[in-house]
Amino acid sequence: MNVRKDALKDLVTRFDNNITAYKDGKNAYNEHSCRIEYIDPFLQLLGWDVPNEAGLAPQYREVIAENYSNKTDRPDYSLTLRGVTKLFVEAKKPSVDIDTESAPAMQARKYGWNAKHKISILTNFEYFIIYDTTTVPKETDDCRVSRYRCYHYKDYIDKFDEIFHLVSKDSVYSGEFDKFFNDTFKGEGSQKQQVDNLFLNQINDWRVKLSNELYSKGNQYTSLEKLNDVVQEFINQIVFLRICEDRNLPLYHKLNETISDRDALHTKLEELFREADKRYNSGMFSGENIIFDLNNNVIVEMIEGLYYPQSPYMFNIIEPNMLGKIYELFLTEQLILLENGRMGLAKKKDCANRSVVTTPTEIVKYMVEKSLSNVCKGKSPAEICNLRIADIACGSGVYLEEAFQYLQAYCVEWYLTNEPDHLIEIGNGKYKLPLDEKKQILCSCIFGIDIDIHAVEVAKFSLLIKLIENETEPSVRDTTPILPELSSNILHGNALVGNQELAGKRYSTDTIISLVPYDWDEMPADGFDVILGNPPYVTTEDMHQLLSDAEFTIYKNKYKSSHKQFDKYFIFLERALQKVKNEGYVCYIVPNKFFKISAGAKLRGMLSNHLISLDDFGAAQLFEDKTIYSSIVLLQKRVQERFTYTNVDSANDLWLGKPTDSIELNNSSLNDLPWKLSPDFEFLATIKNIESVCVSLEKVAEIFNGIQTSAERPKPIYWFSGDEIINENDTTVTIQKGNKKYEIEKSILKPYFKPTKATEKGLTTYTKLSTDKRIIFPYDKSGHLISIERMQSDYPGAFAYLSDYYDRLVPKSVSSSGKRDVPNATADTWYQYGRTQALTAFINTPKLIVKVMAKDNPMYALDNEDMLIASGGTAGYCAVAKKNDSSYELEYIQAWLANSYTERIIQIVGSDFEGGFVSRGTFVLSSLPFVQLDFNDSKQKALYDRVVEASREVYSINDMLDQCPPKQIETTLVRQKDTLIKEIDGLVSRVYRLDF
């Protein structure tokens, strides 16, 4: 740092010696000279590679500087995170007083705001000013509005550490920049509105106003579907023309010129559309024209809203991928007719109950590079045009845009090496392909499918905007039409349902319309080289609500991965593998829970031999305002032998290729069981070493869930706590429920383990269990429901109590007023539990009670009292008992489960929950590895015997502690118990290491 400060001191001294001349407006000292002599070196002292000494490809350069001589309406410097722009620097000559003038500040703020950056820098070297660009720039703002920091050159050395922390390359590349400014510039309100939210709100406002105007005309506009179509089309047309204007592309005349004469507005606008259709010819302007059905005020308001001072938009700064993300949110809503007869917006059915998330740019770029680099390597541009890249749930086309950009960049690099004269220079060492070649790549290589027709139109629109990026009027002069027609590339349909799935079946027209079956014959016959994207995440429960029975049935019948409570992304993964070529790749970002959950078994089995790499974000969060535990899966249709597993903390680290916890493993280690994946290679080696002597725990132990009464809320019916017992004798218990007393027979009661008080919680494995709760158990020793007749004769008190709660207990299948879901219930069995699995397991069966959700205190506690337990999903308990023919005592199984090695496996294969909690339900427990001992080996037998013996010593100590001994004895007993538990853990750990 001192070396940097010394160099900065030289810069400051030289500037100070010449400042009078520099600030003289008559002097020839200009911005060009200031950049070369002062601003470039200053940025380099902040770590930024301004001259690209690293020799990075144009798309990955740290600093993109605009030509000094070719001044455009672009920021002078773009500082990037491996090509992803993070902030702009706007330079001025020293004679421009940026400390007091408003125009330079407005320029810097508008640049940053339109790019959705947190900050922008404005400097003439005399001052280095940082602006907060999360606030909307207003025409009336002076230079002090949103000024976050202002440094004078004489303060640079003293303040260098602070400046370095804020805007250095190290800060940006470490992730500190994002973290600091995300925390610093929090807040909401009209002034804090960022470009995407403001533009989205604006176009949604247009949708409503346009639709109300058209709906009032009647005729064809009374159809909501029609309205949605024509309104979106008109908005796209207006926005496209405005973008072309800011990018200096040819137009018949400017959009705002059409509103100068209100009387001629409709004619001029229609003329502009017609000429745009001739020149661009993408189909965007060839549809129905609604101009003459709109009044002047609506059109004028729209057009004025796209120009300063009404709005601060700069469409040459707003990136195409940001427009795509804005439209992604636009697509979540549709026009509806409100009760008051006016048009409004409402969430589409498939978006109503879930948040729509947009994938971070770094992740999109990483996935595109990771998958496309495999198929592009070594190819010429002519061969590149033979590639077929698809997103089969493309939405707004974010992944397709990035894939198109990657292919362009690859071809530019190839030409720079092999045929540089083929390229067109666009300034400062940057080059582009001729427009015709870009069109060829787009039309030959990029394909998309989406079930939402409006998403299809947005994806086409986004790709066309991407196509004209870096184009100017001279570069398109000789190209007619400028744009291609993409109707053969981006298609409407359900990628999961083809016409062949409907063959031979009779569906109503409405069902077929809702299914939107896709004709795969419209796509390349031999499949795709790459399918990539972020497929829909929709749970089975949500699918039942959102989809027709016909559609859900097709998914269940067609896709092997539609197992148990599957998610929709399961079948997208399966479909993608089906639709790539034999050497093709699939790259998806999906929730990582499929590694572990029971429903993911079929999918795991399907993917295990095709996995190339797995980037696991664990509990790290990638999406704003949405908790999703994510992973990036790269597959190849060809069978793989090895794959790379990477544990990642942030999108930045992945995109930058920073060293991460990464290991290479055999695909043969994966199957349909939960995947045991960890960055701890040594631990995985230990697990691999015991595979040959392991069986799953379910082979040596019974593993079962607790009961489910389905009568817990608002207050439990079947069970009661000690606080509710008002009297007890040898045969009955009297309880107070509400205002009534009930005398219930003890012979129908069982102890019930359900910790509800603070004193009952925090239990661990070797805690002695007790409970003051009891539950009515209306079943015999064989697990059969006790009949009504016997209930009335043998347990009249219990039956009278249950009868008083008949309205709460009666199943839905018995009475229309019923509230409980009870399978197979009848009028004679109305009092049975909601679920009846494993009832006999609670009769005369010692067991371990397992707390399903645990963090630092897993519990596998021994119960010899036949306690019933509650099965409450992740919030409840399950149980483990000894199999009748097992050689292993329950004490040894308990020690195995409580062992630190076992816990590490559970941390890997159990489902993660917020706060570091991990679930260990019956599915996870059943699949745990269990090393089988050789009881003929004296060392192994001795180790086993000692584990059982030490465990029983712990139980004896628990009994003694139950007697509340004096403190001195208690301290000694607790210490002895802890010593025994450590000994038990050490002995079982030796088994894991096969160290007998």
Regions found by a protein language model. Give the residues of each.
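Polybasic, glycine- and aromatic-enriched phosphate-binding surface used to engage nucleic acids
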Residues: 93, 100, 119, 570, ...
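Mixed-charge intrinsically disordered linker/loop segments at interdomain junctions
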Residues: 112-201, 646-680, 686
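A short, conserved, highly charged catalytic patch centered on acidic carboxylates
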Residues: 1-119, 127-165, 175-182
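SAM-dependent methyltransferase catalytic region
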Residues: 28, 34, 51-53, 57-66, ...
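Non-catalytic DNA-recognition/assembly elements of restriction-modification systems
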Residues: 394, 532, 672, 676-678, ...
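Polynucleotide-recognition surfaces of large bacterial nucleic-acid defense/processing enzymes
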Residues: 272-274, 278-279, 283, 462, ...
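Metal-dependent nuclease catalytic cores in nucleic-acid-processing enzymes
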Residues: 39-44, 105-124, 431-432, 462-469, ...
